From Swiss-Prot:
Family membership: Belongs to the MraZ family.
Source organism of this protein record: Syntrophomonas wolfei subsp. wolfei (strain DSM 2245B / Goettingen)
Ranges of residues in domain SpoVT-AbrB: 5-47, 76-119
Lineage of source species: Bacteria, Bacillati, Bacillota, Clostridia, Eubacteriales
Annotated keywords: Cytoplasm, DNA-binding, Repeat, Transcription, Transcription regulation
Protein name per its UniProtKB record: Transcriptional regulator MraZ
PANTHER family for the chain: TRANSCRIPTIONAL REGULATOR MRAZ
């Protein structure tokens, strides 16, 4: 399970260092894609395969399904870790997430998210005031 928050910076080659605590679980080959809220999602291969299977099972005749599947898969790339735990983030994903140099890498259970530091700060400032409301709504889902 991916947990925690880490600050990192991209190097001049667009590489990011994956936190040591995440490396074993993410594996040496993993998938990066456009995430929700303008971040980048990273998935271990086995988790990606589960999501891929679920998305393929959705009815492609629905416009919302087609739109989401296009969004999710068109931005996806299979990435490799080098021996130092680094991986090149594709330019299209960096541009999508507004990442220039400084990033926040967070563990979110079954995936890792990479945020520009600025967007993560803004997200947290805006979300803090609504955490209680969100928690109340989650009760309706049985959590």
């Amino acid at each position: 399970m991916f947990l925690g928050e880490y600050q990192h910076s991209l190097d001049e080659k667009g590489r990011i260092t994956i936190p040591a605590k995440f490396r074993e679980e993410i594996g040496y080959k993993f998938v990066a894609t456009k995430g929700l809220d303008n971040c980048i999602f990273l998935y271990p291969q086995d988790e990606w395969q589960l999501i891929e299977k679920k998305l393929r099972s959705l009815p492609f005749t629905r416009a919302d399904v087609r739109s989401f599947v296009r969004f999710f898969f068109s931005g996806a790339a299979e990435l490799d870790l080098d021996r130092q735990g680094r991986s090149v983030l594709p330019l299209n994903l960096r541009e999508y997430a507004g990442i220039d140099r400084d990033v926040i890498i967070i563990g979110v259970g079954t995936r890792v998210e990479i945020w520009s530091t600025e967007k993560w700060t803004d997200y947290n400032e805006n979300a803090q005031s609504s955490y209680e409301e969100i928690a109340e709504n989650l009760v309706d889902l049985g959590i």
